[in-house]
From Swiss-Prot:
Name by which UniProt lists this protein: Dephospho-CoA kinase
Functional note: Catalyzes the phosphorylation of the 3'-hydroxyl group of dephosphocoenzyme A to form coenzyme A.
PROSITE patterns per UniProt: DPCK (PS51219)
Binding site for ATP: G11, S12, G13, K14, S15, T16
Species this protein is from: Clostridium acetobutylicum (strain ATCC 824 / DSM 792 / JCM 1419 / IAM 19013 / LMG 5710 / NBRC 13948 / NRRL B-527 / VKM B-1787 / 2291 / W)
Pfam families attached to this UniProt entry: CoaE
Length: 201
């Protein structure tokens, strides 16, 4: 089974590319969804979070306020790293288990959609890696429109991530998602042909 890593930055349109793969009947593992599932399945993760970061991110019913916590760690690289050290082993284990299952079912291709594919070295376990790239102006505009943030807030978020230019060094293919949707589709088709993704599909 061909394992493909798909990554990008905030506002790059990675979710759109992921959806296109799904529409092409290609299996996609969404690392963000996996992270939500492991939180449900492994209560010890939230115990570790509470021990490390305190009670501020739990409501009066003891429920984890995921969005508030996300905003908190997004603005602090040391805190984000501490959280990733807690949760990432569970995420990686679940991803490996899911991909092994798909392989045992004789699936030809599986795409892993992961925003921190490179930062957490998951790209090394993939056969091919793809970056969804956009220019910075487009990135800022899209996030402002989607999330209602100020330009300064968006720039701060972008700067808290590994830059798309840096990510380019680690991937095999780049999809320029700055332009027309039709152009993005053509690029995906070319990549799919190059790695024979359509074989058996």
């Amino acid at each position: 089974m061909l394992k493909i890593g798909l990554t990008g930055g905030i506002g790059s349109g990675k979710s759109t590319i992921s959806r296109i793969f799904k529409e092409r009947q290609i299996l996609v593992v969404d690392a963000d969804e996996v992270s939500k599932e492991v939180l449900k399945e492994h209560p010890e993760i939230l115990t570790a979070v509470r021990n490390k970061f305190g009670d501020n991110f739990f409501d009066e019913n003891g429920e984890f306020t995921r969005r508030e916590f996300g905003n908190f760690i997004f603005n602090s690289e040391p805190h984000r790293k501490e959280y990733e050290n807690i949760i990432m082993p569970y995420i990686k284990k679940d991803i490996v288990r899911t991909m092994k299952l798909y392989e045992s079912l004789n699936e030809n291709v599986c795409v892993l959609d992961a925003p921190t594919l490179i930062e957490n070295d998951i790209y090394k376990d993939m056969d091919i890696n793809i970056l969804v790239w956009v220019d910075k102006a487009t990135q800022i505009k899209r996030v402002q429109k989607r999330d209602g943030m100020s330009e300064d807030e968006v720039i701060m978020r972008i700067n808290s991530q590994m830059s798309l230019e840096e990510k380019k060094k680690y991937v095999d293919f780049i999809i320029d998602n700055s332009g027309e949707f039709e152009n993005t589709i053509k690029q995906i088709d070319r990549i799919m042909q190059s790695v024979s993704i359509m074989k058996g599909k």
